[in-house]
């Protein structure tokens, strides 16, 4: 039987008007295109709001491009199109960091600045930015799921893709924390790269629940994973027996969360990520120095490691916080 996880207000600052450094407007107008993993899903729809709204605020012609499938080849084609259009800045949320290296190099050779998100140390990018600390992200998810599982039993791990660095780093951190602190817990099989698809996640969860009758938990780093897993668990009426934690879009997950088919998780706010794309691009185009200790817009004070801009702005997806995010359109 599940153990209840105490609600945590960590990250509630996302709902308040915290005093962040006011981003400077673009000194000269420029054009920016942001290529996301896949278009038409809630997470990236909300990110698009942040991109377009911040663009208008800072005087930047900023827009989002969403491939029809989460296929790296489609991202390559979208980036090639932006190069042909001679945009000033290209932003990317990569599906496969390695596959994008050649086309990002071509962009830089054409004089285009390149910014990525969720791809730390991305080769051929000027900057990558992160809104969540990797070790904390993994540890927080595992602490909560371990509490739910009674610190013992079998669990499975979903990620958005086996080739996206960040979600796999989160998974690595969670698994390492489990091995160090919860020896009676055991991960079944290897991680599954299904969490960008509700259908694939639901099918995989069903397969796992059939194969492992005593499965007690599913963790997912990828916004569609908890939804698919939660639906599978709800349909099997295992809400009270199986714990699901991970990154999900509040509007998609709130009903499953209230029913106990999803139990919680942590996310960054994709609207903030969209805003930060434009804020970092504007700082670069204005010639501002990006270094540890400075503040950049909604990131607040940053740390820099190589070409990665680091911050930590999580929100806990308990019922209370998730409802608030739904109210603001996420």
Model regions and ranges:
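Positively charged n-region of N-terminal signal peptides that target proteins for export
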Residues: 1-4
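Bacterial N-terminal signal peptides
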Residues: 7-16
């Amino acid at each position: 039987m599940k153990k209840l996880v105490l609600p945590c207000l960590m990250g509630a600052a996302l709902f308040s008007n915290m005093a962040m450094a006011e981003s400077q407007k673009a000194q000269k107008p420029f054009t920016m295109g942001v290529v996301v993993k896949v278009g038409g899903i809630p997470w990236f729809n909300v990110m698009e709001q942040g991109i377009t709204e911040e663009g208008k605020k800072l005087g930047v012609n900023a827009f989002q491009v969403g491939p029809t499938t989460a296929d790296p080849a489609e991202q390559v084609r979208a980036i090639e199109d932006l190069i042909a259009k001679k945009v000033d800045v290209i932003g990317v949320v990569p599906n496969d960091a390695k596959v994008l290296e050649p086309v990002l190099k071509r962009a830089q050779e054409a004089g285009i600045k390149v910014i990525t998100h969720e791809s730390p140390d991305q080769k051929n990018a000027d900057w990558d930015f992160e809104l969540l600390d990797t070790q904390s992200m993994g540890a927080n998810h595992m602490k909560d799921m371990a509490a739910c599982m009674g610190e013992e039993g079998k669990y499975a791990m979903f990620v958005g893709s086996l080739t996206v660095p960040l979600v796999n780093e989160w998974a690595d951190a969670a698994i390492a924390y489990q091995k160090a602190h919860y020896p009676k817990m055991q991960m079944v099989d290897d991680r599954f790269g299904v969490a960008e698809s509700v259908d694939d996640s639901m099918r995989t969860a069903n397969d796992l629940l059939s194969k492992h009758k005593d499965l007690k938990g599913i963790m997912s780093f990828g916004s569609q994973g908890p939804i698919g897993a939660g639906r599978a668990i709800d349909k099997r009426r295992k809400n009270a027996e199986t714990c699901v934690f991970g990154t999900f879009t509040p509007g998609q997950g709130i009903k499953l969360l209230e029913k106990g088919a999803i139990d919680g998780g942590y996310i960054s706010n994709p609207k903030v990520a969209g805003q930060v794309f434009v804020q970092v691009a504007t700082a670069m185009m204005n010639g501002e120095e990006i270094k540890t200790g400075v503040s950049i817009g909604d990131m607040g004070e940053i740390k820099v490691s190589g070409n990665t801009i680091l911050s930590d702005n999580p929100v806990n997806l308990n019922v209370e916080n998730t409802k608030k995010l739904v109210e603001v359109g996420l």
